[in-house]
Every structure is written in C-alpha cells, then in structure tokens.
C-alpha cells in the first residue's frame, strides 16, 4: 500500500477503523485546501462507491462541504438500483436518480453510423439499444466504456457548475489490472485508490 497509508502491515492486523479515519482526514484536507464547494459522486450500488460515499459523508460532516450523489442507471438491474438509492439517501446531502439510457443510445447510434456499422440509413428510433450493441465489431468492453463516459460527462458537468470535484471510486486492484476506463470511471480524487479490493471489503 502506498500514498495515504504508507506503512507496512499484515492484512489480518489492519485496523480498519484507523484506516477509515485516515481516509476521511486526507480527503477533508484535499477538498478544503483546494477551496472546493462540493464533492460529486456517482453511486452504482457496488461496494466501492458505497465505501467512498461513507467516507465522503464523514468529510461533509467535518468540513461542511456537501456530498452530491447521483445514481445514473443505464440498463441497470433493479437490485443495483435499489441499493444505489439506499446508499445515496443514507450518505448524500443531495441525491437524485437520472436515467442515462437515452443518452447512451444516442451516442452509440452516432458511433455506429460514423464507423459504418449502420448503412441502411434507418433512423435512431428504429433501433433497440441491444441491436446497436450487437452489431458486428462492437464488444462488451467498448459498450461499457461508452456507458462509463456518459456518466462522467454528467458528473463532471455538475462539478464544473457547482465548483467541486468528482470523487473516484477505483481501488488499487482495479488500477493494477487496468480494470478502469480512461475519461470514464476515474475521477479527480480517489479516497480508496491505495486499498486492494479485499481491503475495501474489510473497510
């Protein structure tokens, strides 16, 4: 582990309460020293965004800087949506759900047209999203990257208008494996970026 928690340790001996408090303090130090007005967080309902929401909630109580949360579903399963709503309402000073499925479809349609995958000149409304996703040459990774970037456009616009920053939810395991999207799910400041996935669960 590097960065905020620059100490040697055995995972079985890790004091997660101490780790949590250090992450809260370091995040609070960053947002206050940069005179930021809000923290913006995309909440998926997964463990990473939930832990970051909990950290930022404590930062908000400590600094008075509000946490703005958004659940931005694109073809999400109902159970993921339910969890994201619970997390957002529990930890955020302001929380909304905004469905980005139409934005995703619009971008996907334009990209398919640009690359020549759509050649019959049928209009946007003629296609289902699944039709576009399954055109020859498209892959689940490419489609997933578009979804992540659609969400970041939304979050960064909020941060820009309200003079804040977007919180990153990536952990060290994802970073080392390359399991993240450039200009997608990586934000401005990552409270859990030095934690391995197992440690995120421990936290």
List the predicted regions and their residue ranges.
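Gly/Ser/Thr-rich active-site loops/lids in small-molecule metabolic enzymes
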Residues: 184-202
């Amino acid at each position: 582990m590097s960065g905020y928690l620059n100490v040697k340790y055995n995972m079985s001996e890790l004091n997660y309460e101490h780790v949590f408090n250090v992450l809260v303090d370091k995040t609070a130090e960053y947002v206050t020293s940069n005179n930021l007005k809000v923290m913006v967080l995309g909440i998926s309902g997964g463990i990473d965004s939930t832990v970051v929401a909990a950290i930022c909630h404590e930062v908000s109580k400590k600094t008075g800087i509000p946490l703005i949360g958004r659940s931005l579903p694109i073809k999400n399963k109902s159970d993921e949506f339910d969890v994201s709503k619970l997390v957002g309402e529990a930890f955020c000073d302001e929380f909304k759900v905004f469905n980005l499925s139409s934005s995703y479809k619009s971008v996907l349609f334009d990209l398919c047209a640009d690359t020549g995958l759509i050649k019959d000149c049928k209009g946007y409304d003629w296609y289902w999203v699944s039709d576009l996703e399954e055109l020859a040459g498209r892959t689940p990774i490419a489609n997933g990257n578009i979804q992540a970037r659609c969400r970041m456009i939304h979050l960064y616009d909020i941060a820009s208008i309200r003079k804040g920053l977007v919180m990153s939810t990536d952990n060290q395991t994802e970073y080392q494996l390359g399991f993240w999207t450039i200009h997608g799910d990586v934000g401005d400041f990552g409270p859990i970026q030095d934690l391995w996935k197992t440690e995120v669960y421990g936290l």
